[in-house]
């Protein structure tokens, strides 16, 4: 786990969960690049910067199906899986762990999705096209 704030880790999984707390930006990217995937379980995300950062690190994502924004990103980019309950979550994690080549390919696809859609020049062009400048 990465991020600020307190988290209560159940005793039965404490040995398997590492709470790194708040990290500086490079350590965050290094942790992301070395991970199996990034999990963004929120049901109430808008645009998720951390998902884009994960894809730039060539890692796939795992998001909650009830979050329209992040599950749409996962579907549109073909760079993530989504879950609705614990059993689907577990299945998705196992899929990534047992299929590292597919996970790596999904991460690369995610990186290209970010570069194709959210690089500064792409965003500026969208604004200019919108305003017909």
Indicate where each model-derived feature is located.
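Short acidic/histidine- and often glycine-rich active-site loop of Leloir-type glycosyltransferases
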Residues: 10-11, 52, 66-77, 81-82
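Short alpha-helical segment that forms part of, or immediately flanks, the ligand-binding pocket
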Residues: 29, 47, 52-56, 70-72
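Aromatic "clamp/platform" in nucleotide-sugar-dependent glycosyltransferases that forms part
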Residues: 43
């Amino acid at each position: 786990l990465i991020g600020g704030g307190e988290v209560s880790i159940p005793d039965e999984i404490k040995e398997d969960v590492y709470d790194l707390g708040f990290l500086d930006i490079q350590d965050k990217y290094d942790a992301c690049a070395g991970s199996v995937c990034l999990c963004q379980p929120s049901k109430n995300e808008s645009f998720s910067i951390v998902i884009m950062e994960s894809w730039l690190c060539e890692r796939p994502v795992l998001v909650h199906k009830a979050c329209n924004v992040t599950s749409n990103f996962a579907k549109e980019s073909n760079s993530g899986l989504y879950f609705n309950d614990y059993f689907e979550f577990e299945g998705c994690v196992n899929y990534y762990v047992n299929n590292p080549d597919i996970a790596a390919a999904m991460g690369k696809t995610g990186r290209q999705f970010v570069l194709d859609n959210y690089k500064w020049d792409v965003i500026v062009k969208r604004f200019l096209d919108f305003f017909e400048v």
